[in-house]
Every structure is written in structure tokens, then in C-alpha cells.
Amino acid sequence: MVVVAILAAGRGTRMKSRLPKVLHSLGGQSLVERVIESVEPLSPSRRIVIVGYQSEEVQTAMHSIPNLEFVEQTVQLGTGHAIQQLLPHLKDYTGDLLILNGDLPLIRSETLKQMLQTHAQNQNAATILTSHLPDPTGYGRVFCNNENIVQQMVEHKDCTAAQRQNQRINAGVYCFRWPDLAKVLPHLQANNAQKEYYLTDAVTQVGQVMAVDVEDNQEILGINDRLQLATAYEILQKRVKEKWMLAGVTLIDPASITIDETVELQPDVIIEPQTHLRGNTVIQTGSHIGPGSLIENSQLAENVTVQYSVVIDSTIQAGSRIGPYAHLRGHVQVGAGCRVGNFVELKNTQLGDRTNAAHLSYIGDTVVGNQVNIGAGTITANYDGVKKHRTKIGDRTKTGANSVLVAPLTLGDDVYIAAGSTVTEDVPNDSLVIARSRQVVKPAWQRKSVENKTTDQHK
């Protein structure tokens, strides 16, 4: 049985931000959410987040995560002081306590499982995660014997010049037998350069403590500033992109592509440069995305093409072509075999199968039938200044260039709208609509106009 405690009370001053450090986003999730996610496969009996700086904001940001407990550290006096706040909440607990910093977003569940197994097999009072770094600057040092039993732990700022030569560092992940730690916590002293209560001071007081090295140093990258945040994002993206390329997805110029972990891709999808896939996006086999496109929270069926376009909260059926320079947003549904072309915006709109909107159009709050052709420059005037109104366009209807459809409006099946028309009334099936001024031609008007102006000037 294990209880998890996540340290999320610090401000993170080096981030230079009003936002608490643990709430900074990495690939669509906050740092602390990623840590919480990493402990889920361990099936902990309780998950406790220790909050402090802007605690209400931190708690609000995680309100949707079920069965999460919060304990407040009103004054931030170090990691040991943070764990002291758990004493009244774990009075009768006799199991293990796994402690992680809330700024370790790349830690893997497998690493934590291995650490817990080592802890149990060796009946340790405590087990800590360590690593060897070529440049350990900024990390606390761990000193062990040949059997990886910890002899001493020293924070970087408290290290002597000789101690700083040690490259074995504390990764900020601990597993304690809680009863042993609970006895030591009240007696911690702030005898250090920071005048803080260090959890590391408790390590050598609880009994046998073993160090376990992490295999991949990238997992223990702590996020203290924007540079480290960017580095973590690069590592995360490398993991994601390698996964999909090995699964049969082609990424052309992977360095210029970003893919959230929540995205699902099928084999034989091709992603061109400068394309960004975000949120709960699913792209099925044979689709070709990019270059220069953003797909967010959208589902694309087989053999869809998207070029230089933005697709958000939309569904696109098989064989449809989007772009270049199209914008789909607000729960758009595009049927099979459609074309949404140059400078077309769709908002909260449904297109039937084999419907085309190829050029320079805005279609909003509209249901469009099958085999409809939206002429260049067609606009749905759906907003009256107070409310947005719906438009319905029947099957096989064709709108001429530069048409304006003033909602609320219903066009039946097989309707033809003449170019330049402004349509304000419902149109029945099989109708032709001409809603524009009659053309008037005045021969020689320009010559007469010039002559009149010349005469006026000589008066």
C-alpha cells in the first residue's frame, strides 16, 4: 500500500511569472498534472498534493481530477516542512509514502514501479531516486557506499568544493516507510544556508536508505525556468514523434512538427512540415496533413487532405480536401468527398457528401445538403446584432458568385441562386432566385460626362 504526496507549494520565481510554476503547460497539460498522471499506474490508496503559493488557483486548476486531496503549506519553509504538514492527515497510516516534486513532468511510471519494487524487496526504510550527471550544478548530492546504501545527502548550496565534485545527484523522488519518517519529521532543524527544513536531512535518520539510479536522465529534468520548460518540451516531442514514426506514420521534417500525446494517428498518415496536431485529434489512414496546418480536437477519416489550414473542433469524412487557407471551427461536420477551398471559413456548419465550397466564402450556423456548390464569395449573414440564426441549404442547390444568404433562411433542393443575389426569403425546391438590381447601360455616358465637366469649367 502506498500513499503519494506531490510537492506543489513553491512559487518558482525563476519562471518570472504570476502563474504558479506547477501550472505551466507542457504539451497541453500542466507540470503537476503530468506528475499525477505518472503515479496512476501505481494504484495509490491516496494522492495528496501539497499546495502553498496561490493554493486556490492550483486547486481550481485540478478540480476535475477525481479523488485528489490537497494539504496547504501556508509558509514555504522547505521540503521537510512541506511533508510535516502531512502528520495530522496520516496519523494511523502504516504503509509507504512516495514523494515527488511537482515539477518532474517527464518521470515515467515504469521508473516509479521499479523504485517501489526495490524498496519492498530490500525492506528499506527509505529509497531515493538518483542519477549521475556530467554537470550536476544545482542538484543536491548523494553519497553512497558500494552497495548503494546512502551515507549522506547534501544540498548544492551547502556543499563544500570537494563535495560538489560528486556527480551523483538527488532526483527529488523518495519512498519512505511512513511510520519511520513520521518519527523523524518533528525533529528536523533548519541548520543550512537556506534556513529551511530539508527532507534530505530525514533520509539518514530513518534507517537503511538505498539509492536507485534512473536509466534515462531526461526523466528527472526539473523545471525551474523557461529554458528548462522548452528543453522538456523537446524531449516530450521526441518521444511522441518516435512512437508514431515506428507505428507507420510519415513525418516530413519532424523538427518542425508538434504532436500532443493525446493525438491518435493511423499507419500511412503523412504529416508535412510546420503542422501542429493538438488535443483529442484522430487522423485515419491515408490522410495527408500540411504543410502549415493546425488540427485541434478534430476527427479526420481516411484519405483526407488538409493544406495550410486551421481545423478546430471539427469532423471530416473520407476523401475530403481542405484548403489551402481554410478555417473550420465550432463543431463543423464535413461529409465525404467534399472540397473546402481557398479562404473559406466554416463555423458551426454541416456539409453533406460531395459538397463544394471552393473559394472566398463564410458559411456559419448552416446545414448544407449533398452535392451542393457554394459559389465564390457566398456569405451567410447569420448575425443580426443580437442573435445568430440558422440557414438550411437543400441537396444539389447552387449559389452564384457573391451571393448573400440572410438568415434565418431555408433553400430547398435543386435551387439556383443567381450571382450577386441577396436572398432574404425562403425558396422552394427547383427554383431560380434572382435578387439583384437590373443592369442599366447608358451608352457614351463617360464622353458626355467629360464634355459637361469641360463646359462647366469654362463658364
UniProtKB/Swiss-Prot annotation:
<dbReference type="GO" id="GO:0019134">
    <property type="term" value="F:glucosamine-1-phosphate N-acetyltransferase activity"/>
</dbReference>
<keyword id="KW-0012">Acyltransferase</keyword>
<comment type="pathway">
    <text>Nucleotide-sugar biosynthesis; UDP-N-acetyl-alpha-D-glucosamine biosynthesis; UDP-N-acetyl-alpha-D-glucosamine from N-acetyl-alpha-D-glucosamine 1-phosphate: step 1/1.</text>
</comment>
<feature type="binding site">
    <location>
        <position position="376"/>
    </location>
    <ligand>
        <name>acetyl-CoA</name>
    </ligand>
</feature>
<dbReference type="GO" id="GO:0071555">
    <property type="term" value="P:cell wall organization"/>
</dbReference>
<feature type="region of interest" description="N-acetyltransferase">
    <location>
        <begin position="248"/>
        <end position="459"/>
    </location>
</feature>
<keyword id="KW-0511">Multifunctional enzyme</keyword>
<keyword id="KW-0460">Magnesium</keyword>
<keyword id="KW-0808">Transferase</keyword>
<keyword id="KW-0133">Cell shape</keyword>
<feature type="binding site">
    <location>
        <position position="347"/>
    </location>
    <ligand>
        <name>UDP-N-acetyl-alpha-D-glucosamine</name>
    </ligand>
</feature>
<feature type="binding site">
    <location>
        <begin position="382"/>
        <end position="383"/>
    </location>
    <ligand>
        <name>acetyl-CoA</name>
    </ligand>
</feature>
<dbReference type="InterPro" id="IPR050065">
    <property type="entry name" value="GlmU-like"/>
</dbReference>
<dbReference type="GO" id="GO:0003977">
    <property type="term" value="F:UDP-N-acetylglucosamine diphosphorylase activity"/>
</dbReference>
<feature type="binding site">
    <location>
        <position position="155"/>
    </location>
    <ligand>
        <name>UDP-N-acetyl-alpha-D-glucosamine</name>
    </ligand>
</feature>
<feature type="binding site">
    <location>
        <position position="419"/>
    </location>
    <ligand>
        <name>acetyl-CoA</name>
    </ligand>
</feature>
<dbReference type="InterPro" id="IPR005882">
    <property type="entry name" value="Bifunctional_GlmU"/>
</dbReference>
<dbReference type="GO" id="GO:0009252">
    <property type="term" value="P:peptidoglycan biosynthetic process"/>
</dbReference>
<keyword id="KW-0479">Metal-binding</keyword>
<feature type="binding site">
    <location>
        <position position="21"/>
    </location>
    <ligand>
        <name>UDP-N-acetyl-alpha-D-glucosamine</name>
    </ligand>
</feature>
<protein>
    <recommendedName>
        <fullName>Bifunctional protein GlmU</fullName>
        <ecNumber>2.7.7.23</ecNumber>
        <ecNumber>2.3.1.157</ecNumber>
    </recommendedName>
</protein>
<dbReference type="Pfam" id="PF00132">
    <property type="entry name" value="Hexapep"/>
</dbReference>
<comment type="function">
    <text>Catalyzes the last two sequential reactions in the de novo biosynthetic pathway for UDP-N-acetylglucosamine (UDP-GlcNAc). The C-terminal domain catalyzes the transfer of acetyl group from acetyl coenzyme A to glucosamine-1-phosphate (GlcN-1-P) to produce N-acetylglucosamine-1-phosphate (GlcNAc-1-P), which is converted into UDP-GlcNAc by the transfer of uridine 5-monophosphate (from uridine 5-triphosphate), a reaction catalyzed by the N-terminal domain.</text>
</comment>
<dbReference type="GO" id="GO:0006048">
    <property type="term" value="P:UDP-N-acetylglucosamine biosynthetic process"/>
</dbReference>
<keyword id="KW-0677">Repeat</keyword>
<dbReference type="GO" id="GO:0005737">
    <property type="term" value="C:cytoplasm"/>
</dbReference>
<feature type="binding site">
    <location>
        <position position="73"/>
    </location>
    <ligand>
        <name>UDP-N-acetyl-alpha-D-glucosamine</name>
    </ligand>
</feature>
<feature type="binding site">
    <location>
        <begin position="78"/>
        <end position="79"/>
    </location>
    <ligand>
        <name>UDP-N-acetyl-alpha-D-glucosamine</name>
    </ligand>
</feature>
<comment type="similarity">
    <text>In the N-terminal section; belongs to the N-acetylglucosamine-1-phosphate uridyltransferase family.</text>
</comment>
<dbReference type="InterPro" id="IPR029044">
    <property type="entry name" value="Nucleotide-diphossugar_trans"/>
</dbReference>
<dbReference type="InterPro" id="IPR001451">
    <property type="entry name" value="Hexapep"/>
</dbReference>
<keyword id="KW-0963">Cytoplasm</keyword>
<dbReference type="GO" id="GO:0008360">
    <property type="term" value="P:regulation of cell shape"/>
</dbReference>
<dbReference type="GO" id="GO:0009245">
    <property type="term" value="P:lipid A biosynthetic process"/>
</dbReference>
<feature type="binding site">
    <location>
        <position position="103"/>
    </location>
    <ligand>
        <name>Mg(2+)</name>
    </ligand>
</feature>
<feature type="binding site">
    <location>
        <position position="140"/>
    </location>
    <ligand>
        <name>UDP-N-acetyl-alpha-D-glucosamine</name>
    </ligand>
</feature>
<dbReference type="InterPro" id="IPR011004">
    <property type="entry name" value="Trimer_LpxA-like_sf"/>
</dbReference>
<dbReference type="GO" id="GO:0043886">
    <property type="term" value="F:structural constituent of carboxysome shell"/>
</dbReference>
<dbReference type="GO" id="GO:0016020">
    <property type="term" value="C:membrane"/>
</dbReference>
<dbReference type="InterPro" id="IPR038009">
    <property type="entry name" value="GlmU_C_LbH"/>
</dbReference>
<dbReference type="GO" id="GO:0000902">
    <property type="term" value="P:cell morphogenesis"/>
</dbReference>
<feature type="binding site">
    <location>
        <position position="170"/>
    </location>
    <ligand>
        <name>UDP-N-acetyl-alpha-D-glucosamine</name>
    </ligand>
</feature>
